[in-house]
Amino acid sequence: MKILYYIILLLPSIIYSQEKISGMIMEANEKNEPIGLAGANVYWLDTEIGTVTDIDGGFNLSYDPKFKKLVISYVGFKTDTLTVSNPNQPIRHWLRPTDNLDEVTVTTRKPSTARSYLKAQNIINVNSDELLKAACCNLSESFETNPSIDVNFADAISGTRQIKMLGLTSPYILIATENIPSIRGASQAYGLSFIPGTWVESIQITKGAGSVVNGYESIAGQINAELLKPSKDAKLFVNLYGATNERLELNTHLNTSVGSKWHSGLYLHGSTLNQKHDVNHDNFMDMPMYDQINVLNRWQYTDTENGFVSFLSLKFLNDTKQTGELNFNPDTDKLTTNAWGSEIDTKRFEISGKFGYVNPNIPWQSLGIQTAYSSHEQNSYFGLNIYDITHHSLYANAIYNSIISDSRHKIKTGLSYTYDYYDEFVNTLDFKRNENSVGAFFEYSYDNLELLNLTAGVRVDHHNLLGNFITPRLHVRYSPWRKSAFRASFGRGKRSANIFAENQQLFATSRAINIIGSSGSIYGLHPEIAWNYGMSYLQGFNLFGRKGDITFDFYKTDFVDQVVVDWENPQEINFYNLEGKSFANSFQTEVNYNPFEYFDLRMAYKYYDVKTDYNSGRRARPLTPKHRFFANASYKTELREGKQGRWKFDATFNWLGEQRFASTQANPVSYQLPDYSPTVATLNAQITKVFSSKFEIYLGGENMTNVKQNNPILGADDPFGANFDSTFVFGPIFGSMYYAGLRFRIE
């Protein structure tokens, strides 16, 4: 079938190969001199006959007298249509840059968050300016100013932030670092806090089914964090942070060039909190004491003349946490009933490599190879519960990019391999498993830039536990009129549920753990399978002479099979495969507007309908608000000529509707909760004073409304009793927190 497809595409070029036209497509350099534009699309209007300009901008194209209109296009330039009357006369044509094809921006000058009008996938690009609107000490804190991601604490003990997208928790989101899956398996619970915010250059958030190139596991979407590149980062960067809760952080970047083609970067992170806090006076720490050391060494090789670029990254992490009752002493009270306490010690090592080659003579052909290995070891206990996990992971992906006929028709194809070894110790039981998979993928993209994009992909995988399966995904973008983009997508995802690693908050309870099932291949359970469908509409506008845009998103996730995490019996947590329906519906509308120069406003409303058929009946997913309102305002003063100093002001407001509590009706009356939580409203703000390109200071506050959950731990007065549970967290625990910091860099 594929061979027939190639023949059909190439046949018109063969038929009309008797006559040809030739020419050169150009752009202007910095001196306004003409230079050849490589990779430009040149094709006959309303045909499949076309080509791409070579490295010098030249082209040759089949001609027939019935062909009159020649279309020339390139991303970032105005598409031109020429009338060809004399095929014997070489064509020399300049393409002009245009603002009409740029990404839509939500700030007037330098966009901090952007959506593209041109891409088939619904991708939100977040750059470093957006990340600097909040302290963003680590990746889990980098979404406070983005309405597409929900952030809340997983429990009242560990201080772990949990993210959600489209109403689903992070295990259903593929979280990658430079397009290599990184937050998965053993790192699912705490991994977002293992990536310091200053290391992140930009974040790409993809809603709905992602690309088949990145694997088969994503269901709700993908989050990719691009790290700083040694060749572009400052030679020296220092970020110092301190907060009123006595949290201290230091980040240092050291970058240097080694010859003309090698660059190296050393990134150091240290953070600590060694003070006990109990604002709600329940005798439990509101946040854990911890120490973290994080070291990253990156090597970059760039040879643009020959088309080579490669990265090698080595990372080591040591993270220790202690939490529990105020009088808990791990030296004397560990795993006893003297006092309830917990320690979580994590050591992680990662090495990854990326190799890319672009043929200098054929720039539309490229080869990329990604490899990564990680070793993750966590030793922990929660009161009398023990949980240890060792996870070794290997990942490899090879990607070949090319075109068919002309650059409107692009293909990606390749092979991937993954290996995971898990060894988990839960109280007295040992759980082990090996997972390995090999897969092949093919993705076709059609792009005529201004009107229509289509990306269709399929991958076939063989997995030793999940079997053989196919993963199809499709994305379409259509622009019916100016400054508009209508998108639709669907795709399938399949994954193994890591029931313990992904739900570590269960250990900070007195619940009995039950796995109901024995016929599945993953601890007796079957894999999770879901389909995601989505539609999105983006429209730009001008109001009172100022730019803005409005977006409407609707996504639906239907589970064919799911590992249900059932909290409805307050003395148990039950894991079993779905019998019935489980779905997540998400609607979001977002408005970005620039009312006046240097001031940007973003507002969003989000509605969730997330329900599952539990053994006790269909219920809404616990602790998932149906309604959320979000607003962010940012302003920066104008840069005056000859001066580098300016002020920046940012404020973010979040309102969460009521959230359903899992049932506590079987508890004694004194340990019962209402059916729903109160609503929550929080305000974060930050002021930054930029003195120069080298130095700036910032001052901010989180939860300035001082909202706090007074009794987040059920049964805190009897932590070893049958009703102890720290998972009923619907909002902030600590109350207001203020911080200050500085940034210093030498370019």
Regions found by a protein language model. Name each.
Residues M26-E33, A38-L45, S73-F77, P87-L132, ...:
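Short, acidic, small-residue-rich periplasmic hinge/interaction motif at the N-terminus
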Residues F59-S62, I180-K207, V295:
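Short acidic/polar hinge/loop motifs at secondary-structure boundaries
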Residues N88-W94, L139-S142, R161-K164, Y190-P196, ...:
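N-terminal periplasmic accessory domains that precede
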Residues S140-P181:
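Extracytoplasmic beta-strand/coil segments of soluble accessory domains associated
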Residues L273-N294, Q300-L367, Y373-H391:
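Flexible loop and strand-edge segments within Gram-negative outer membrane beta-barrel domains
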Residues S366-S380, S479, R487, Y523-N577, ...:
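Membrane-embedded beta-barrel scaffold of Gram-negative outer-membrane proteins
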Residues K494, W655-T664, T688-E747:
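C-terminal beta-signal and adjacent terminal beta-strands/loops
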Residues F554-D558, N577-A662:
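Gram-negative outer-membrane beta-barrel transporters
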